Amino acid sequence: MRTSQYLLSTLKETPANAEVISHQLMLRAGLVRNLASGLYTWLPTGLRVLKKVEQIVREEMQRAGGNEILMPMVQPADLWQESGRLDDYGPELLRINDRHKRPFVLGPTHEEVVTKLVANELSSYKQLPLNVFQIQSKFRDEIRPRFGVMRGREFLMKDAYSFHLEDECLEKTYQIMFDAYCRIFERLELNFRPVLADTGSIGGEKSHEFHVLADSGEDDIAFSDASDFAANIEKAEALAPAGERAEPTQTLTKVATPNVKSMDDLVQCLSVDLKTTVKTLLVVGATVEGEAETVVALVLRGDHQLNEIKAEHLPQVATPITFASEEQILAAANCNAGSIGPVGLNIEVIVDRSAAHLSDFVCGANEDDAHLTGVNWQRDCNEISVHDIRNVVAGDPSPCGQGNIEIKRGIEVGHIFQLGRKYAEAMNCAVLNEGGKNQTLTMGCYGIGVSRIVAAAIEQNHDKYGIKWPKAIAPFQVAIVPMNMAKSARVKETAEALYESLNQAGIEVLFDDRKERPGVMFADHELMGTPLLLIIGERNLDAQQIELKNRITGEKSLIAIDEVMSLFN
């Protein structure tokens, strides 16, 4: 490809609205352009990268036994009503009507469509197991699209679905797909971690996320410093402290705490360690339809944070988790939110394991501007239940029993689930088993954010000059950069001959035939991340040599013209 025929849209300045480095470089290097909030046009350079990622994903899915299909992006809302997700999915699901006022949705995922397809196409256990996949655009109406294609509203995704008669067969396919995902990210040369994960709105029984480690990641990943254990912080279990709870040594005392509005204020006011305090949060309780709304108290150690996902899994807590209103707080505790405590509460009290291990602790007195010291669970509080409801923190013992927890940021680029029979039961997806009876199928689903991988790769592979692509997904393998070609027939002749040879050999080459200053040309290629530059200058041609520059290492060397082709053998 010649730059004179190529849409090379580089920018010198960083756009003001680009927050993370991948978004900045994708705009500056001319990979994408923003159309509207969360919507991007892929320009030629970006599309070349995207297609290479897509092809690696496709190859590994086929190697894992996947059959490629393509399903409609627009889906009948009736399917989502049938699965029970139409109302549950929330405002991220874009709903539309056709000219006949029939309701449709713009697909954020395709469980319903593929389940209906398989229910209609399969009739016998002899057709199982089946694994199908597609690579297609999805749409999720994110409330705050950000970070460029990392969290856009429209994005390219590979979603695969497997169907099985028995759970044992699902487990085997799940492991095959897990291994395929690892191969994909290894081929992409990404530093990644597979981690245990929550199943979220898709549902299911077992789940792993695949995270590319990067400081710009939106997820916290907890992993052991002594084993292979890794989990999303939403999923990582916080173990109960070792040993027995200490016996009480203090008497229960109420103390004045005027103007205390936060845990930090409390620590300063009473000169206590935050680890010896507890905080009490009131949330809406789970109720049966028609019953009055209730509230539930969640109690954590003062230095710990509530894990909302864990709390939502408790049967006593409404889903999605909703914090109590001021009116509900006053009715339940007779004080403002900053003074709530577990002593004397006449509602259900759920205490985190670490908080339950405390003795002689400090808590709110359920009275404005007052707290209690010397509090002990068995002596001073009504009945409580103890659960793991907090986020793990660095230094916690790993739940695997080996080492301690470390925390790093990650960008989620893949997610696999064992869905079980949730969708198949709802949509009557069954086949005749060996005994001639109808048997509901069990499912797995497996997603990869193809467009997000491009951004994640940049987050891990860049320097102050631009992108440093992994070889497998670089837009071009090499660029020819002739110096002052317009003034030197010899430079032009050498560049043209080299371009022709590389093209004939199937090498992806970008011939920079612009009438530009060398500095501008070098800056553009460094920004775009072209792995190798072949720099042709009049002086080196006297010795039948050209300069070779490696974008990854920064090394420069002279190479004989007739040795150039050997670089790609």
Curated annotation (Swiss-Prot):
Protein localization: Cytoplasm
Protein keywords: Aminoacyl-tRNA synthetase, ATP-binding, Cytoplasm, Ligase, Nucleotide-binding, Protein biosynthesis
A single GO cellular-component term on record: cytosol
Signal peptide: none
Presence of the UniProt keyword Nucleotide-binding in the record: yes
EC numbers for this chain: 6.1.1.15
InterPro entries: aa-tRNA-synt_IIb (IPR002314), aa-tRNA-synth_II (IPR006195), aa-tRNA-synth_II/BPL/LPL (IPR045864), Anticodon-bd (IPR004154), Anticodon-bd_dom_sf (IPR036621), Pro-tRNA-ligase_IIa (IPR002316), Pro-tRNA-synth_IIa_bac-type (IPR004500), Pro-tRNA-Synthase_IIa_type1 (IPR023717)
Main location: cytoplasm
Subunit composition and interactions: Homodimer.
Protein family according to the UniProt entry: Belongs to the class-II aminoacyl-tRNA synthetase family. ProS type 1 subfamily.
Domain notes: Consists of three domains: the N-terminal catalytic domain, the editing domain and the C-terminal anticodon-binding domain.
Protein name (database record): Proline--tRNA ligase
